[in-house]
Structures are given as structure tokens and as C-alpha cells.
Amino acid sequence: MATGTTSKVKVSDTGVSTPLGTLLKPLNSEYGKVAPGWGTTVLMGIFMALFAVFLVIILEIYNSSVLLDDVTMSWESLSK
């Protein structure tokens, strides 16, 4: 039968309680619950947009699209 069990181990005997697990237990107390509404979705979108702007700035510096004084992007300058 697919629902039968083969071991005599109790569920409570399978885990070990550690100080770290006890410390982190409150973080898992809301498991499975979903906040109503949009929650922090807008905040996440703002941070994603800021991160995208950051990546574009880094790409432009790397491609020398943005000229900065005393900033060179070459392997020779890194070896000095």
C-alpha cells in the first residue's frame, strides 16, 4: 500500500534542536501565510529599478560610454 509506513521512528525523534535553530525559529513562524494586498511588491519594484540603473551605469563605465577623469578600463592599468 502506498500510504503505509515501514519504520517505527517517531516524528519527534528525527530532529535535533540546536541553539541556532531556536534562534531562527521566529523567522519561520509565518510560514505559509500570505499578506493581503500587494504588500511590499512596490518596494521590491523600486529596488529592482534602482539595481537596473546601477547595472547600466557600470556597463557604460566599462564600455567607456561615460568618460571619467583618471578612470581607465584596461588590463595594463590594473597591473601598475
UniProtKB/Swiss-Prot annotation:
GO molecular function term, any single one: phosphate ion binding
Residues modified as Phosphothreonine: 6
PTM annotation: Phosphorylation is a light-dependent reaction catalyzed by a membrane-bound kinase; phosphorylation occurs on Thr residue(s) in the N-terminus of the protein.
Record field: transmembrane: 42-62
Pfam family, one: PsbH
Signal peptide span: none
Location in or out of the cell: Plastid, Chloroplast thylakoid membrane
Claim: DNA-binding is one of the keywords in the record: no
UniProt record, GO biological process: photosynthesis; protein stabilization
Similarity comment: Belongs to the PsbH family.
Quaternary state and interactors: PSII is composed of 1 copy each of membrane proteins PsbA, PsbB, PsbC, PsbD, PsbE, PsbF, PsbH, PsbI, PsbJ, PsbK, PsbL, PsbM, PsbT, PsbX, PsbY, PsbZ, Psb30/Ycf12, at least 3 peripheral proteins of the oxygen-evolving complex and a large number of cofactors. It forms dimeric complexes.
Purpose of the protein: One of the components of the core complex of photosystem II (PSII), required for its stability and/or assembly. PSII is a light-driven water:plastoquinone oxidoreductase that uses light energy to abstract electrons from H(2)O, generating O(2) and a proton gradient subsequently used for ATP formation. It consists of a core antenna complex that captures photons, and an electron transfer chain that converts photonic excitation into a charge separation.
NCBIfam families (UniProt xref): PRK02624.1
Name listed for the protein in its UniProt record: Photosystem II reaction center protein H
